[in-house]
Every structure is written in structure tokens, then in C-alpha cells.
């Protein structure tokens, strides 16, 4: 019986000891919080906010340790940055496929390529929307001290909100251009032998058909100019 009591007290003592250790560790971590917060704020102010780049750097092991729990807050920015880079790369690939479409005849003969590229862009947009929803949810649940929140909010606007707006615009314009190219290809195909192809141009015998073709082509070129303007903005942030 004494042996059982001894074992019981040992278990109780061990439990109390471990509980005390946990509280000590928690207290120690809490004592580091001001220092960790200060380090994180300084990092955001010196490495993120002044940078012209859209992407954000990956934290080193030392930085993660110095930021403590705030390394998880930074993950919101870095996770989105990683997804954004992948999305832009995917959109560029879709547009590269379109570079093989260099003539009116190509828009007829390569409609499958155009349609495939458009579906890829649609998939990228769907993933972008899901990613942004997840990021916004994580961001809304943050509980940060006021001094950190003021700086982090600026970093969030710069590295998430603004890039997301540019990516959304890029994908929408790309989809519109691909849709217009597909529409032109279908239109030319519907005319059959009423249209002749000479080099990169299409020749019509009916003025109304030519006018409609030019109208469609002009609308597509306007969208291409809009996409080029967005691309220039992005080029300055690479």
C-alpha cells in the first residue's frame, strides 16, 4: 500500500513539475514578445515596405526565431507571394502559347490552342480567388498590438492587396483577349471560302464582312494595349 502511495505521489509530483515547466516556458516566451515584435516591425519597415518588388523574401531560420509567433503572421504574406508568382508564371505560359497565333489563318486553324490557353487562364483565376479568400480569412483573424498592426496593414496592402488587383486585372484581360481571338477564328471559319488568306492577312469580297472583321480585330487590339499597360506596371516591380 505504501508502495502504491509512493507511486501515486511521484506521478502527482511529476505532473505538477511538468505543468510548472510549461508555465515557465510560456512566461519566458511572453517576456520575449516585445523584443520579437520590435524585430518583426523593423523587418517589415526595412525589408518589405521600401522594396519595389511584389515578391517577398523567405525568412531565414534565425529570422523565424527572432520573430517568434509573428513568423506565422508573416507566412500570410509569403504564402500569397508564392501563389502569386506561380499564377503569373502560368498566365505567361498561356500567352506564350498564343504567340504561335500570328495571322488571321492561325486564328482559324489554332482555335484548339486558343481554347486550351483560355481554360488554363480560367483555372488560374479560380485558384487565385480561392487563395485570396484563404488569405483574407487568415488576415481577418489576426490579433496584433496596435504598433505592429499599423505596419503590418501597410505590408499587407503592398504585398497582397495591390498584387492581387494586378493579377485579377491581368487574368481578366488575358481571358478577354483569348475569347476575342477565338471569336474571330470562329467568325472566319464560318465564312468558309468567302474569305481568302494572303500572308498574315484575310481578304474579303464582302465589305460588311470586312467591316465586322476589322471591328472585332480592333476590339482585341484595344484589350492587348490594356494588358501591355498592366505588364509595364508589373515589369517595374520584378
Can you say where each PLM-predicted feature lies in the sequence?
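Sec-dependent bacterial lipoprotein signal peptides
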Residues: 1-26
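Short, structured coil/loop segments at alpha-helix boundaries
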Residues: 17, 28, 56, 60-71, ...
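Prokaryotic Sec-type signal peptides and long signal-anchor helices
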Residues: 17-21, 44-47, 208, 217
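Leu/Val/Ala/Ile-rich N-terminal alpha-helices, chiefly Sec-type signal peptides and the beginnings
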Residues: 28-111
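Residue-level detector of alpha-helical secondary structure
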Residues: 45, 71, 78, 85, ...
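Amphipathic alpha-helical coiled-coil segments and their boundaries
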Residues: 59, 63-66, 70-73, 96, ...
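Extended amphipathic alpha-helical interaction segments
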Residues: 108-203
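A cross-kingdom marker for long, charged
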Residues: 194-238
Amino acid at each position: 500500500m505504501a508502495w502504491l502511495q509512493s507511486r501515486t505521489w511521484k506521478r502527482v509530483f511529476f505532473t505538477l513539475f511538468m505543468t510548472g515547466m510549461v508555465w515557465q516556458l510560456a512566461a519566458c516566451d511572453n517576456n520575449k514578445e516585445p523584443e520579437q515584435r520590435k524585430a518583426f516591425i523593423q523587418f517589415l519597415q526595412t525589408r518589405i515596405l521600401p522594396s519595389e518588388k511584389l515578391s517577398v523574401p523567405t525568412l531565414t531560420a534565425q529570422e523565424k526565431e527572432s520573430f517568434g509567433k509573428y513568423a506565422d503572421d508573416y507566412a500570410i504574406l509569403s504564402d500569397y507571394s508564392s501563389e502569386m508568382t506561380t499564377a503569373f508564371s502560368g498566365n505567361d505560359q498561356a500567352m506564350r502559347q498564343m504567340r504561335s497565333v500570328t495571322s488571321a489563318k492561325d486564328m482559324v486553324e489554332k482555335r484548339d490552342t486558343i481554347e486550351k490557353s483560355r481554360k488554363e487562364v480560367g483555372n488560374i483565376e479560380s485558384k487565385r480567388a480561392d487563395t485570396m479568400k484563404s488569405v483574407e480569412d487568415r488576415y481577418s483573424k489576426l490579433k496584433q498590438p496596435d504598433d505592429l498592426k499599423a505596419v503590418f496593414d501597410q505590408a499587407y496592402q503592398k504585398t497582397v492587396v495591390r498584387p492581387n488587383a494586378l493579377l485579377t486585372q491581368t487574368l481578366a484581360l488575358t481571358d478577354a483577349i483569348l475569347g476575342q481571338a477565338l471569336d474571330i477564328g470562329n467568325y472566319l471559319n464560318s465564312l468558309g471560302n468567302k474569305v481568302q488568306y494572303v500572308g498574315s492577312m484575310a481578304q474579303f469580297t464582302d465589305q460588311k464582312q470586312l467591316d465586322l472583321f476589322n471591328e472585332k480585330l480592333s476590339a482585341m487590339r484595344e484589350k492587348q494595349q490594356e494588358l501591355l499597360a498592366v505588364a509595364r506596371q508589373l515589369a517595374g516591380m520584378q
